[in-house]
Each structure stands twice: as structure tokens, then as C-alpha cells.
Amino acid sequence: MRNSFFPAIGVFSLASALICSASSSWETDWNKALEKAGKGGHPVLADFTGSDWCPGCIYLRKNIFDTDAFAKYAADHQFVLLELDFPKAAGKMPPEQLKFHEELMRRYGVSSFPSVLLMEGNGAPYAKIVGATRTPEEYLKKLEAAGETRRKLKETVAAAQPLKGKEKLEQLVKALNVLPEDLQPFQKGLIAEISALDPEDRYGFAKK
């Protein structure tokens, strides 16, 4: 496991002080985070981190996630923040929880720290951000790009619903192709719809 790191702030107000509570409101329970996101239709920001040994992870938390700028953005966009930690210090995390985090790491193909997955409440990711940035503003630009992917995916799927047959199939394929190829297999429902309209698997999505 390698760690990704781009090495190297804010106007303080009562509002930002209140928003900054987001920095201490990270969930650490996978199921609770997804349940909360699912109920509210909110996106999940899942941070795969080595909080006590990974320099890039420590930098990302201190210089990006614990800033007013990020806290405001996370609150405005109603993120459910989820920390999936891989500590090395003995006794910092129950072995069964660490084992579950390792299972999630394999499931989502996480190969470096820090890695952030943006996903829906059903666990389907729509974007991945690997490493840190020098400033919060640079990181927020990455989150904006991820949010645009999410919006485009939802809009393209919605546009397919009134269609039928080949037209619907092509629109659903277009929707799936909004995502990076490595994240497409997690869209189980969308792939099932495509497969039902494409029994000969001409588009090859049944194999995903």
C-alpha cells in the first residue's frame, strides 16, 4: 500500500464556526453512514485513510478537511462524511472493524492512501479522488467535478425513463458511460436495466 501526497487559512465568523462542527461529525460506521445518506438522498464522502502513519492522510485531514472552506462546502452539499481508518497503533481499532475496512478496500479497488470515494447511499461510487491537494480550494474543485458527474448521471438516467426499446437502451448506456470505467460495475441497477434491453449483450455490460 502506497500513500499519495501533494505537500504544501480562512475568514472566521460565527457562521463558519458553526459550520466547522462538520469537521468533528465524521461517521466511522459504514452501515450508519450509508443508511443516513440513503434516507436523505445525500452523497457520501468516504475517506480511506491511515490517520496515524500516512503523511498524505494527515495533511489531507489537517489542511483540507479541518478547514472552514471544506466544512462549509460539505454542509452546503449535505455530504455524509465517513472515515474508514487503517491505523497502525495497537488497540486503536477493534480487529473486526479493521478487517471490515480491509474488505471494503478490496471491494472498491483502493490501492493508495489517502483515497476518497464519493458515493450514493446504496454504496455505488460515482467519483474517486486519490491524494491531497495543496489548498482547500484546489480540493473543492475536484469535489465540484465529482458533483457534476453525479448530476450528469442522474439527468441522463432520468432522460431514459420515458423512452422505449433501442432508444432507451442507448440512453442508459450513455448514462453508464458518464462514469469512469472502473466505477461502472457498481451500478448494478443500471446494468440490470441495460441487460434486460440488450439480451445479446452487444454492449458488453452484462459481464461487468
For each predicted feature, which ranges?
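Positively charged n-region of N-terminal signal peptides that target proteins for export
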Residues: 1-7
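Bacterial N-terminal signal peptides
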Residues: 8-17
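Boundary at the C-terminal end of the N-terminal hydrophobic targeting segment
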Residues: 20-22
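Thiol-based oxidoreductase modules, predominantly thioredoxin-like and allied folds used
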Residues: 24-28, 49-50, 63-99
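Local sequence-structure signature of Cys/Sec-based thiol-disulfide redox active-site neighborhoods
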Residues: 28-70
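Loop/turn elements at helix/coil->beta-strand transitions in domains of secreted/extracellular proteins
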Residues: 40-44, 77-82, 111-114, 121-124
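Non-catalytic, surface beta->alpha helical segment in thiol-disulfide oxidoreductase systems
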Residues: 63-65, 103-151
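Non-globular targeting/processing and membrane-anchoring segments
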Residues: 141-208
